[in-house]
Amino acid sequence: MKETIQADWIKSEAFNLENCCNDNPLNILGPHFVNGQWITRVWMPEADEVNIIFKDKTYKTTTLNHKWLFEVTLPEDPKNNYQINVSRGGVSHSQQDPWAYRKEWMGELDRHLFAEGNHHHIWEKMGAHIHEETNQQGVMFCIWAPNAKSISIIGDINSWDGRHHPMQKRLGGIWELFMPIMKEGDAYKYEIRTQEGHIYEKADPYGFLHEIRPQNGSIVSKLNNFDWEDSSWITNRDSSSQINKPISVYEMHLGSWMHDSIENKYIEKNGQTRSPVPAADLKPGTRFLTYPELTEKLIPYVKERGFTHIELMPISEHPFDGSWGYQVTGWYAPTSRYGTPNEFKEFINRCHAEGIGVILDWVPGHFPKDKHGLAFFDGCHLYEHGDPRIGEHKEWGTLIFNYSRNEVRNFLVANLIYWFEEFHIDGIRVDAVASMLYRDYLRPEGEWIPNENGGNENLEAVKFLQQANHVLFQHFPGALSIAEESTTWPMVTEPTNVGGLGFNLKWNMGWMHDMLDYFEIDPWFRQFHQNSVTFSITYNYTENFMLALSHDEVVHGKSHLLHKMPGDDWKKFANTRALLTYMWTHPGKKTIFMGMEFGQRQEWNVWDDLQWELLEFEPHKGIRNLVDDLNKLYKNEPSLWKNDFDPYGFQWIDCNDTSNSVISFMRRENESNEWLVIVANFTPNFHGSYKIGVPLEGFYKEIFNSDGSKYGGSNKGNMGGKETLKYNIHNYENALEIVLPPLSVSIFKHQLKQ
C-alpha cells in the first residue's frame, strides 16, 4: 500500500514538473533519505540516459513513473558532491545538479526587511548573482512573485524551455534556484506560470544587464568588480550640502548627442571588434557612441564648457528609443545600447576625475506595459494598482506603481540607493512628480478615485517620495535630489521631518514658462509683459529652485531655443544671449539642454544627433563662447550662487521701467557689500546714457556684456566700467550712467578700495 502511495505521489510530482506546475521541486528532486536509503532523483527532460558520478564511480539510474524522472540509490548522502552524466541523441555531457543545493538564499531578516519595505540593499539578494555554494561556482537566482503557480529559469542553457529548471518557492513569495551550470554572460528570463495557467516570459526586474533591443532577455553579470578611483570626490561631496555651491548642469541624451558611422567599428581594449548598435533609420548608416567613446569625447567637451554636472536622461534599460528612456523595463541596469555596466562606471569615474558630477533622470512614477516587464508580473497586479483609475496613465499608455505595497516601495527605494552606491552617481532628477502627487492628473471627472480623505492627493505617493528622499540623504548626505514638479504643491524642498517631500532642489517651471513666453514676444510688445520677467522673484524663496531650459521645451513643434526668438538672425542670437545671461544671474541653480550651448537650430530628435556643423559659423561659436564664459564667471563669483535661496542675496534696483523693457538688480554674497549689478535691456533699442542707482560710490567694473564681439554681438559697452555719479535715483544717492547695448545683459562689479 505504501509503495502504491509513493508511486502515485512520484507520478503526480513528475506530471507537475512536466507541465510547469511544481512550486516545490526540492520536495522530490536531489538527494533524499527514504526508508533508510539515500535516493537521488534527477529531472532531465528529453534525456535518453542519465547516470550519476559519485566518488569516481558511475551509478546507472532508472526511470520511475515518468520517462524524464531518473532515480538512483547511493551508498551514502552525496550532498552536492556528485555529477550528472546526461545523454541526448547520442551526445553526452556532465553537469552539477541544481537541486543538490538546498540552502535558502534569502534569510529571515532579509525577508522581514523586504516585507516591511526597508531592505535598502535588496539588489544584493534579488536577481541573478554569480555565487559560490559549497565550493561550486554558479548563479543564484532569486525573484519575488507571490501569486505565481510556478517559475522556471529559461535561457540558452535549456533552449528556453521552462520544463527544465523549475525554481523553489520560499516564504514571502520568494523563489530561488542555484544554477551551477550557468555563468557570467548567459542570457535568461523567468518563465512564470500563473494560477490560471497562462505563461509569461519576464526579464529580471533586478537584472544588472539586459540584451540589446529588440531582444529583451536579462544577462548574468558581475556587480562588484570595478576599481573606483574617486574616493576623494565622494568624501568631499558628502562632507557638506551641495546646494550651497555653484551648480550648472548640462542636460543630455547619450544616444542623440553624437553618432558615428556604422562602418567605424569600436575596438575594445582586448582588440576585439564590438558589433555596432545602429542608432536609427533617420540617419541610415549611423551608430551610437559607446560608453568608452563618450568618455573620450563628451567629458572633455563638458569640462571645456565649464558645467559642474552632467544630467543624463534615463539610462536604465528601456526597449523603445522613442520613449527617450522614460519607459523603463530594466531598473537596475544601464542600457546595453552603449556598452557594459563597468564601462558606464568608468564614464562616471572619469567624470569625477575631471570635476564633473553626474545626475541621472529617475522615473519612479510609471512603467510601460511591455510583456517582458513589470506589468501583470506574476499573473496579478503585483507592481501596479489593479484599478486603472489609480494604476494607469491612459494618456501615456503606462502603469502606475502601487506605492501602498511595501515590497514595491522597497524595489524603488533600493533602486535609488543602488545607483548611488554601485555607480557613484551624484544626484537624481525625478521626472513628472506632479503625475505622482495627484490622483486626478490628466484624468477627466469620473476616471479617478479620491483618497481616504476625499481629496485628489496621492497620499501613498507622498509617503513614498518622503521615504525615498529620507533614506537617500541618510546614506548620501551630499546627494542632489531634484524634483520636476509643475504645480504649486507646497514644501517640495522642505525636509521630511517637517512634512516636506524631502527634495533639495525643484525645477522652476513657472520661471521657464514665463521667460519663454516673454522672449517669444516681439520686443516692442514686451513693455506690456514686464511682469513675466519679474514675477519669479515674488515666490523665489518658497522653494530651493533650479532654473531649467530642458529637453521638453525643444520638441513637439516648440522649436529649439534659438528659433523661439522673434526677428531676423541677428535678433535671434542676441535674444538667446540675453536670455542665457539673465538666467545665469537670476537666483537659482542652472540647467540647459544639449544644443542650447551653441544655438542648435533644429528641434531635438531622439533619432538624430546635434548639428555640430553649425560650429563652423561665427554666431554659433559666439553662443558657445558666451556659455563658456558664463560658467566661468558663475563659478568665480560667489554672489551668483551662494545666496540663491536667501533673499539677502538679491535686491531690485528697478523692475518698473516697462516702457524701455529694462530691469536692473543686484546680487551679493555676504556682509562685505561687494554687490554685482546686473542690467538687462530686452529690446533692440540702444541706450547711450542710462542711469541706475547703486548703494556704494566708486568704480564699477563691467565684468560681462552679452553684446561682446566674442559672443557675436555689436560690441557696444562701457569701456571696462564706470565711476559713480552723485545723483539721487532708485532711492540711492549714487548712480551709474551706462551704455545699454541692444538685447543684452551687462554685469558690473563694485571695486573695493584698497
From Swiss-Prot:
The source organism is: Prochlorococcus marinus subsp. pastoris (strain CCMP1986 / NIES-2087 / MED4)
Q: How does it assemble?
A: Monomer.
User: What protein am I looking at?
Assistant: 1,4-alpha-glucan branching enzyme GlgB
Q: Which residues are the active-site ones?
A: D431 (nucleophile), E484 (proton donor)
What's a BP term from Gene Ontology annotated to this protein? glycogen biosynthetic process
Q: What is its EC number?
A: 2.4.1.18
Which chemical reaction does it catalyze?
Transfers a segment of a (1->4)-alpha-D-glucan chain to a primary hydroxy group in a similar glucan chain
The taxonomy runs:
Bacteria, Bacillati, Cyanobacteriota, Cyanophyceae, Synechococcales
Output the superkingdom of the source species. Bacteria
The pathway it acts in is: Glycan biosynthesis; glycogen biosynthesis
| A GO-annotated cellular component | cytosol
Q: Which GO molecular function entries does the Swiss-Prot or TrEMBL record give? A: 1,4-alpha-glucan branching enzyme activity; cation binding; hydrolase activity, hydrolyzing O-glycosyl compounds
